[in-house]
Amino acid sequence: MSSETFEFQAEISQLLSLIINTVYSNKEIFLRELISNASDALDKIRYQSLSDPTKLDTGKDLRIDIIPDKENKTLTIRDTGIGMTKADLINNLGTIARSGTKQFMEALSAGADISMIGQFGVGFYSAYLVADRVTVVSKNNDDEQYIWESAAGGTFTLTQDTEGEQLGRGTKIILHLKDEQTDYLNESRIKEVVRKHSEFISYPIYLHVLKETEKEVPDEEAEETKEEEDEEKKAKIEEVDDEEEEEKKKKKKTKTVKESKIEEEELNKTKPIWTRNPADITQEEYASFYKSLSNDWEDHLAVKHFSVEGQLEFRAILYVPKRAPFDLFETKKTKNNIKLYVRRVFITDDATDLIPEWLGFIKGVVDSEDLPLNLSRETLQQNKIMKVIKKNIVKKTLELFNEIAEDREQFDKFYSAFSKNIKLGIHEDAQNRQTLAKLLRYQSTKSGDEATSLADYVTRMPEHQKQIYYITGESIKAVAKSPFLDSLKQKNFEVLFLVDPIDEYAFTQLKEFDGKKLVDITKDFELEETEEEKAEREKEEKEYENLAKSLKNILGDKVEKVVVSHKLVGSPCAIRTGQFGWSANMERIMKAQALRDTSMSSYMSSKKTFEISPKSSIIKELKKKVEADGENDRTVKSITQLLFETSLLVSGFTIEEPASFAERIHKLVSLGLNIDEEAETTEEKATEEAAPAEATTGESAMEEVD
């Protein structure tokens, strides 16, 4: 048959070049990847056969075979899985890059380990770590048998296979090993790698071993010589006793010959680890199973092995990885972290209803005794048993998180990797919100560089503090210097720093912790005060009432209201938002979303309250100025505008007209440096002939800032 030649997709070509031309120490992972792919192919055909048993007519024995051939320097990995059609071979092995191809190359360039390859969905190409040429023979029930072949030189060929050994169904990958990689043809080396990486694959893995046995066979030549000697003796001996005749028969001469034969040795006889008693399983066995399940090269962070009995029976092993996967929040990607078995028979790894999205990083196995074997994905979603299993998985996972929290070092690793998931859980899972809230950690005005839990925060609350306070912003540096903190620090009230974009979403849903309301101090709120403080506040509000009205008239629609604030201490003013709209931080986040709903933006955008502090010397002087010259004075307007714009920045908002703001600042700088604009160059004068002469007094210069 004639061959067709195809070019590899550009990113795949780059990946192959990287794999071939870089020296990697742990090349052995190629075998793990190919066995893992074979196991996936077997999973698929077994799943299909549950609804259509005739799918297995082309081969009922589901298995993986490893066949070393020292003479031809090839290593073959064969499975009786679903096989690939011609289109599958073209798409899956060359012309369509998977989403992880580019990310994996970036990770490699950044110094990541080659053993991560399976996590990015491109494990097949690890074959080129040890082989200079790879041949793939594959037969799917819906197509003819085809041969895919490539030496990774930018192209691959595809040929219909009519003459070779017919597989019936499945895939055979033949690795033509590099001269320096023939170690992988040795029985002991193959066993070592399989035991290390693939011991817990749920299909039998058979190694084809060439065994030489010694066998005793009759020595024909010796027998002929003996017969001649016997003929000579016959003339001399008259009779032969019957017993002696019998003895002669017994003493027939034999010789030892060596006989070669291929034996199949099963390498993974261990029964499914989740069916065993947890007390009998070592940490090494859990780690080995985790790696075979997840394609991770690192050990897991924590594991939970449990069984549920009663009206519903199932066993499960759940793992928390050490790191978040690169595509953790990629919504289009199928999550296949939990493998669902029914009575030890694999059903699917795409049971989206088995675990909530916010727990998408958990990996593991669930084996149910109660689900029917012939479940379709559609009926899985409606199945009541699945809902009960999901509830139990979430419950046990939360128990596992609390166990991790008991070890400070382990919890720091966990929180660094998966804090966003915890917060997403608080946002989405109303039932477990309060339990998850106990896992939150934040820096605060009292925690220093350490992070504090909400429970620890509550223990430090002064007796007269009734609420938990927090501030949202872009960074710790930004919020730590916020004017909103002043009055709370003065009262010895601790404030939590929320600087992750998802924090505000989570706290909006959480609303309270331990019976105490969560309060965003960038929004309007009631601050606890004594009777003396209340009397002083009311007095100051009355005293500065007219100034507040004047400033509102100057600022117009830019603010909803101007109020005299007792919540500011060192700062002259700040901008706070209403309780029910977006905070400054949320407005910034929403503006950054390209596909946001603009109608929602106008509805939810912050209703700004301009707060002025009667204790500030700037506000005191501004009050005098307004009383003396009125609110229409140019200097008053300029100062008010400048105070408003600086408050926007300090409070976390953006300025709508940054150029005008910059111009005002530049004029202030000129004033501070006593720059006389009349002394400017002749050129500048010519362009500004119409401009009024600059006054030299501070007041007239300030008028020009407008």
Swiss-Prot record:
The keyword Phosphoprotein is annotated on this UniProt entry: no
Principal subcellular localization: cytoplasm
Keyword Nucleotide-binding: yes
An annotated Gene Ontology molecular function: ATP hydrolysis activity
Binding site for ATP: 37, 79, 124, 377
Coiled coil stretches, renumbered: none
Low complexity compositional bias, start-end: 689-700
Pfam families on file: HATPase_c_3, HSP90
Localization in the cell: Cytoplasm
Protein name in UniProt: Heat shock protein 90
